[in-house]
From Swiss-Prot:
An example Gene Ontology molecular-function term: thymidine kinase activity
Gene name of the record: tdk
Subunit structure: Homotetramer.
Taxonomic source organism: Halobacterium salinarum (strain ATCC 700922 / JCM 11081 / NRC-1) (Halobacterium halobium)
Name of this protein: Thymidine kinase
EC class name: transferase
Lineage: Archaea, Methanobacteriati, Methanobacteriota, Stenosarchaea group, Halobacteria
Catalytic activity line of the entry: thymidine + ATP = dTMP + ADP + H(+)
Length: 195
């Protein structure tokens, strides 16, 4: 793979929950910091599982982050929050509105490396915008896989469980949770109730 070095670019790390997306994002941030690059991290206000101003992984690793409201206005404020950082990390991109795509384009055009992580599918197995749009404009895309909690195969789906049972198709899309409300599942074991 030829690395881009003369301009900004966009990287997307995606996949199901528990696939290591945030771990990979944190790894890239650590490498950028070791290389002497200034790093800024952003996380949505809806995800406070690991602390108010923290980008955190299920494995317990974390990074200080600026909390941004997941609104058009909040996303538009991201460039104004920066102080010359060359690397901008955005975790849980799926919780931000479509305006995030234009902001990432702007940051990359300004010569910055933009690294995003977020799941590309809802619990229904449908596209979770704006991540698919971000994947389309990105120079680099990595799709991570977890392990299916039912059969052990590679998992690419988010199984939402409510009181231990698969969620209904009509349940709300956004519901921040951890192991008690979601499991990684493969295509064959993924269930969405429609009755």
């Amino acid at each position: 793979m030829h690395a881009i070095t003369n301009s900004g670019w966009v990287e997307v790390i995606t996949g199901s929950m528990f696939s290591g997306k945030t771990e990979e994002l944190l790894r890239r941030l650590r490498r950028a910091e070791i290389a002497g690059q200034d790093v800024a991290a952003v996380t949505p206000a809806v995800d406070d599982r690991y602390g108010e101003a923290t980008l955190g992984s299920h494995a317990g690793r974390s990074w200080a982050a600026t909390v941004v409201e997941p609104t058009a206005e909040g996303v538009a404020s991201i460039p104004t929050l920066l102080n010359g950082e060359q690397v901008v990390a955005i975790d849980e991109a799926n919780f931000f509105p479509a305006e995030l795509v234009d902001v990432c384009q702007e940051l990359a055009a300004d010569g910055r490396r933009v690294v995003l992580s977020g799941t590309d599918q809802t619990f229904r197995g449908e596209p979770f915008e704006p991540v698919p749009q971000l994947m389309a404009i990105a120079e680099y895309v990595d799709k991570m896989r977890a392990i299916c909690m039912q059969c052990g195969e590679p998992a690419t789906r988010n199984q939402r469980l409510i009181e231990g049972e698969p969620a209904h198709y009509d349940d709300p899309t956004v519901m921040v949770g951890a192991e008690e409300t979601y499991e990684a599942r493969c295509r064959n074991c993924h269930v969405v109730r429609r009755e």
